[in-house]
Amino acid sequence: MFPALYVYWLFPGALILLAYWVFAQWQKRHTASALTLTQAILFAISSIVFIVWINLWHYEQFILAFAALAVTSICLFMLYLTYPLTENKMNGRLPISIAFAAIAFLAFLTIGFLFISNNLIDFGLSRQLWAVVLLTCAAALALAIRFHRYDAAFPAVFIWFLIGVAIANNFNELLVTTAALFLSGVLIVGIIFIRKRLPANANKKRL
């Protein structure tokens, strides 16, 4: 269920977007749309814990690394929720959305890695079926974000990863490749056709 190596080039891109986001927040620091204390704390925690994750993964402390990745995902999700539903801009929610999506999918991949490395694959399901289950859960999360948060960027990142999974398997594992392509198609349809009327408070910024 692991993607082709090219997909990981998304992470340097996400870091560049976050660097621009930080610069944009600095420019807005004296305006009404300035970063709140809650947002600053959540971003700082997620950044620090992600650095910790890099070190834990490097030293093969995989379970602790997953815990750090989970904390990073939670902090980014909480930061993501502080933004209005309509603020899909480069200096607003968009960089956070892309970073959150990349970290969330990385968490799903880490779960799969832990299952394989610790021989936890059981319950009568093959490795391929477990991969399909995890990919389906990932796609369900992306669709939920698309529907409830009016966000096309989040599922787009998941499509990038899912296509990478299909390319990496190259039809050697037909079930996983087919599932990855099918779920990519579902997410594309979701991005294009999912429409829901914005609530009255859609432009309200949370603390």
Predicted segments with their positions:
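Alpha-helical transmembrane segments and their membrane-interface exit regions
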Residues: 70-81, 136-139, 162-164, 183-192
